[in-house]
Amino acid sequence: MKYADRYGNRWEETGLQDRFLEKLYKSVPGRAVVKVLVHPWVSRMGGWILSQKASCWLIPLFLKGHPMDESGWVKQRFTSYNDFFMRKLKPGQRPVEEDTARIISPCDAKLTVCPITEYGIMKIKHTPYTVKELLKSEKLARAYEGGYGFVYRLTVDDYHRYIYTETGKKSGNYKIPGIFHTVNPIANDLEPIYKENTREFCLIRTTDAGTVLQMEVGALMVGKIEKDQEEAFVHRGEEKGRFAFGGSTIVVLYQRGQVQPDQDLLDNSRDGYETKVTQGEAVGDKVGKCRK
C-alpha cells in the first residue's frame, strides 16, 4: 500500500492483511472462497458474532497489534468487540475545522481525491468508474459531471464514527443493495467494488457548496452501517453514523465549480498515494469563499 501524510512524507507498507488478501483475490482457490465471503449473510453472521459478549477476548489481541491512546475514549470497558470497535471519543479529540470556507473530512481515513470528467468518469486507484454506476441513477450522476469525488477508505485502526461534512437540508437515505467485497485496494484492482458493494447515500443541499452527496459503502465483515434515516436539517461536524467491524468507505461528491481540493491531496492521489486524514480536518476550499 502507498501512503502519504499532510507533511509531505510518502511511504509504502504491506501488512499481514494485505498479503492475505492478495493471495485470496489472486489465486483460483482464493477466488472461490471470495464468492462465498462476499454474500451479505456472511457479513451479517460475522457482525452478530462480534456483537456478543464472548467476543470481548478479541479486544486485547487487537490492541496488541494496534496500540492506541485509551485516555481519549469515553469508556474503557466494552460489552462486545463491536462495542469497542464503535467506541466514542471524548469531546475535543477530533476538532472540526472552524473556517467554513474550507471543506472537511467526515472521518479518519486514507483519502483519494478523484476529478470527475465531463463524461462522469472517476478513477479510484487506477480503476475507472462512472458516477452513474456508483449511484445507479443517470439523472443524478449528471449533476456531478466535472466535479470531484473524495474517497475516504477506513481501515480497522481508524475511528469508525463519521460526521456530516456540511450544514444544510438532508434528504432521506437511498440504499443500493449489493454484496460485500473488502474495500482494500488489492480487491479494487480486480473487482469493481464501488459499483458492486452495498451502499447508501443522502444529499445535503447547502447554501455555499451546492448539493453535496455523502455515501457510505459497506465492506466485507461490516455487519451494519448505523445511521439516521430521516430528512432533516443537519450541521457540519454533527455525528452522522458509525460502522461496525471491518474496513469501510465514505464517498463525498461535489458538483462542478463548488470546491477546490488541497493541492497535496491532488498530487498524492495522482501518484497513487492515499493520504491519511482525520475527522474534521480541512481538505479543500469552497470556490469563491474567502478563508478566515
Residue map of PLM features:
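Contiguous, well-folded functional domains in the mature portion of proteins
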Residues: 1-292
